[in-house]
Amino acid sequence: MKVQILGMGHSLPERILNNQELEQMVDTSNEWIVERTGILERRIADKDTATSDLCWQAAKMALERSATEAKELDLIIVGTSSPDMLFPSTACIVQDHLGARNAAAFDVEAGCTGFIYALGIAEKFLLSPEYKKILVIGADLCSRFTDYTDRNTCVLFGDGAGAAVVGKGNLGPGILSSYLAADGSGGKHLYMPAGGSALPPSKETVEQRLHFIRMDGNEIFRFATKIVVAVSEKLLSQAGLSYQDVDLFIPHQANLRIIKTAMKRMRIPAEKTLINLDHFGNMSAACIPVGLSMAEEAGKLKKGDLVLMVAFGAGLSYGGILLRWGRDQDVF
């Protein structure tokens, strides 16, 4: 039995925030942003849009593409760092909106690795006979926690959501290997100080701007360039494959320099690497599922293609999924 992706979906806000607009907001320039990040523009949700809104929109597309009804879902997992509220979970809000009454629902908070964590967890659930179809979503409204007076972080982030319906198939296409990991000692390099039980919201935390993303970019760069290669090697080794076998490499879209460094070390060419951060920025947990969904939509994937997905994020969390693209005709 293989765990297969039965259908993908994505949702992106309409509003585009380009580098020229950011030039008017902070001390930066289009040239500075492009040179250091590779980003030209990003999508920003309007004030009335919540993470769950993008989630259910992406989910509806995935359900339609997989020919799945909401009532068939056994579980919904949402990977997000920007839930609608502390509770109930965003997954429960999505479950209600979709009318997926038979599905259990919970969120996973693994930063930008959220979708990979959620998909890896779904894979394990599907090894049980109780679960047949699971909706996995990676979504974040990073703009809600971005400090638009900090030029080092405000140029990076965008909003979006990607979804996958996963199920069981016979031997053939499907997940070949998965790996989830974390290094909690690096948590201090990427975090949001206030808003939790350690430092609850207060007048003081708001005045001190403690509800925004804090990041040590140099530390994250050093971590990411090593870990992307290490995770990729582990996934391919587990499956008895090599870099030369990869048809599509989908890395987390944090920074173009990180991606190019990984490509060079792994000798994966540009034509086999998905890069969309130039138009969408870092959408956190949404990067990989949005990329995969749009690649399928554009006809860039064919059955049998080997897809390598690797992410890293706050925690510091990291992980990856290696899969053979496609689905059986007799999915049950």
Curated annotation (Swiss-Prot):
Keywords for the protein's UniProt record, in alphabetical order: Acyltransferase, Cytoplasm, Fatty acid biosynthesis, Fatty acid metabolism, Lipid biosynthesis, Lipid metabolism, Multifunctional enzyme, Transferase
Matching InterPro entries: ACP_syn_III_C, ACP_syn_III_N, FabH, Thiolase-like
Catalysed reactions, as listed in the record: malonyl-[ACP] + acetyl-CoA + H(+) = 3-oxobutanoyl-[ACP] + CO2 + CoA
Taxonomic superkingdom: Bacteria
Biological process, per Gene Ontology: fatty acid biosynthetic process; secondary metabolite biosynthetic process
Pathway: Lipid metabolism; fatty acid biosynthesis
Intracellular or extracellular location(s): Cytoplasm
GO molecular function: 3-oxoacyl-[acyl-carrier-protein] synthase activity; beta-ketoacyl-acyl-carrier-protein synthase III activity
Entry-linked Pfam families: ACP_syn_III, ACP_syn_III_C
Catalytic residues identified in the record: C112, H252, N282
NCBIfam families, alphabetized: fabH, PRK09352.1
Family statement: Belongs to the thiolase-like superfamily. FabH family.
Protein name in UniProt: Beta-ketoacyl-[acyl-carrier-protein] synthase III
Organism: Syntrophomonas wolfei subsp. wolfei (strain DSM 2245B / Goettingen)
Taxonomic lineage from the root: Bacteria, Bacillati, Bacillota, Clostridia, Eubacteriales
Gene for this chain: fabH
